[in-house]
Amino acid sequence: MDNIGAADAATSSGISGLLSGNSFLGAGIGLMGFGAGLAILRRGLISGASLVKRRMLVSVEIPSKEKSYNAFLHWMSTVPKRYSNQLAVESNRQLKMPQNAREKPDKQVANRIFSLVPGPGKHYIKYKKCWIQVERERSNRLQDLTTGTPWETITLTTLSRDRGIFSELLLEAQKFMQSAQKNKTTIYTAWATEWKPFGHPRSKRMLSSVVLESNVKKMITDDVHDFLRNSQWYDTRGIPYRRGYLLYGPPGSGKTSFLYALAGELDYDICVLNLAEKGLTDDRLNHLLSNVPPKAVVLLEDVDSAFQGRERSGEVGFHANVTFSGLLNALDGVTSSDERIIFMTTNHPEKLDPALVRPGRVDVKAYLGNATPEQVREMFTRFYGHSPEMADDLSDIVCPKNTSMASLQGLFVMNKSSPADAVDMAKELPDNPPSTPFSFNVHRKSLSV
């Protein structure tokens, strides 16, 4: 044992002598020790920061495909306590209309309303006594295939264990967006497999501005309101909670205009879908009709045109990718969704397959025809005020000509302040073929069941 101790002492004294005699070697070993210490400290700090982040920080990520993405950006632009180093500009073009009829058109001003939203980078906001870091990231490689815009995400991080702060924030952002779109109607169109807003929200149209036969307008409006009030009635009886409407009649009778005004009356948006659109398949159609935005009606315009060649060439030969059976399954098949209102329009009801318009797929059929004496008088009064004799004279001229309501409105627009000129010009309107309600009860051969 004494020999071993003596050997260790000799070795230690030798190393000490070597280090004291070689300053470079001593400095190198010192630097190695210092570097190792820094590496251990760095690893400890990273582990500690990661632990603190897991235990004390809460984060939520909002991808650009989410509807709350734009809502949050525009809400954040209104936050007073905000620190942003980088901003992005978004503009909205609005046309300032003349204040009175005497103002000349060249005085109309195209205004652009600019809003500064947070740009890519890190920003900080204070919300309900909590500081939140907002990081907006934009990918240089990934793109949204439906819009062609770069893929973006927003990450919210706060030093709080209360996850409810994010729910409250996003709910407030959603309410902010809804208040900004109050008294507006958003038009959606199909982009790939999802609905995207088409342009900016439009001002609601008053239902009274669409002149239809009073019984038709009241019948449809009352039926829709009754449907929306009785969801529980459908549930308790096991009936699918959906409603289908068919508006048919000659061109210019007000089918689309009425739906736009009805959506405003209901405070609903409109999803427009063209069945003849290139690339629209059965699966995509089914997905779109099963994922309609909340509080929105679906409009299938000119539904007859998508399948007008089907009877002649079969399901393989017509120009659209949607099959007739695919449409029927999307409307009321096993995978079709509930809580849905669908409006179809057509100028040629005789071309529709009976399987498409049977109850369950089309529950209400309404004929919107050419101008009737009642409609002529009502529209005349709206434009020129009360003048029964002149309104009757106009009615005697246009009704035998089977004039459409669109043509009648165009006549009034051309003669804004001269009802007498409108009556004289009405004599030059062309004669149109008569149009009458179609009898769907007549037995016709069905191509599908």
Swiss-Prot record:
Residues 42-449 are mitochondrial matrix. Residues 1-20 are mitochondrial intermembrane. PROSITE patterns: AAA (PS00674). It is an enzyme of class 3 (hydrolase). The chain crosses the membrane at residues 21-41. GO terms for molecular function: ATP binding; ATP hydrolysis activity; protein carrier chaperone. One of its GO terms (cellular component) is mitochondrial inner membrane. It catalyses: ATP + H2O = ADP + phosphate + H(+). It comes from the Eukaryota. It is a single-pass membrane protein. ATP binds at residues 249-256. Pfam families: AAA, AAA_lid_BCS1, BCS1_N. The keyword Chaperone applies. It is found in: Mitochondrion inner membrane. Keywords: ATP-binding, Chaperone, Hydrolase, Membrane, Mitochondrion, Mitochondrion inner membrane, Nucleotide-binding, Transmembrane, Transmembrane helix. The keyword Mitochondrion applies. Its EC number is 3.6.1.-. GO terms for biological process: mitochondrial respiratory chain complex III assembly; protein insertion into mitochondrial inner membrane from matrix. Chaperone necessary for the incorporation of Rieske iron-sulfur protein rip1 into the mitochondrial respiratory chain complex III. Belongs to the AAA ATPase family. BCS1 subfamily. This is Probable mitochondrial chaperone bcs1.
